[in-house]
Amino acid sequence: MTISKERKEEVISEHGAAAGDTGSPEVQIAILTERINGLTEHMRTHRKDYASRRGLLGLVSRRRRLLDYVRGQDPQRYLDIIGKLGIRK
């Protein structure tokens, strides 16, 4: 599922270093997390929607790669991101 433009701007302002910061890994991970949460809710009611399931797996995979990149660059930043977004353990 897509997220609204307003919600996307909120996420960018919350996680970005500057107002227009859309490229930093933190912002990208936060936006992907919002989209993943929306699709997860969709999948709870539409269990047999296999096309959406495939899209969800792709988003999770993309987020995983970004998280791996951040963990390799700066482990403390990685821990901050997963703590702030409430993902992982």
Curated annotation (Swiss-Prot):
UniProt GO cellular component terms: cytosolic small ribosomal subunit
Annotated S-S bridges: none
InterPro entries given in the database record: Ribosomal_uS15, Ribosomal_uS15_bac-type, uS15_NS1_RNA-bd_sf
Presence of the UniProt keyword Protein transport in the record: no
Domain of life per record: Bacteria
UniProt entry keywords in alphabetical sequence: Ribonucleoprotein, Ribosomal protein, RNA-binding, rRNA-binding
SUPFAM superfamilies per UniProt: S15/NS1 RNA-binding domain (SSF47060)
Entry annotated with the keyword Transport: no
Residue span of region Disordered: 1-24
Bias (Basic and acidic residues) ranges: 1-13
MF-aspect GO terms: rRNA binding; structural constituent of ribosome
Signal peptide (residue range): none
A Pfam cross-reference name: Ribosomal_S15
GO biological process, one term: translation
SMART domains: Ribosomal_S15
Entry function: One of the primary rRNA binding proteins, it binds directly to 16S rRNA where it helps nucleate assembly of the platform of the 30S subunit by binding and bridging several RNA helices of the 16S rRNA. Forms an intersubunit bridge (bridge B4) with the 23S rRNA of the 50S subunit in the ribosome.
Family the entry assigns: Belongs to the universal ribosomal protein uS15 family.
Subunit text: Part of the 30S ribosomal subunit. Forms a bridge to the 50S subunit in the 70S ribosome, contacting the 23S rRNA.
Protein name according to UniProt: Small ribosomal subunit protein uS15
Lineage, uppermost ranks: Bacteria, Pseudomonadati, Planctomycetota, Planctomycetia, Pirellulales
Gene from which this protein is expressed: rpsO
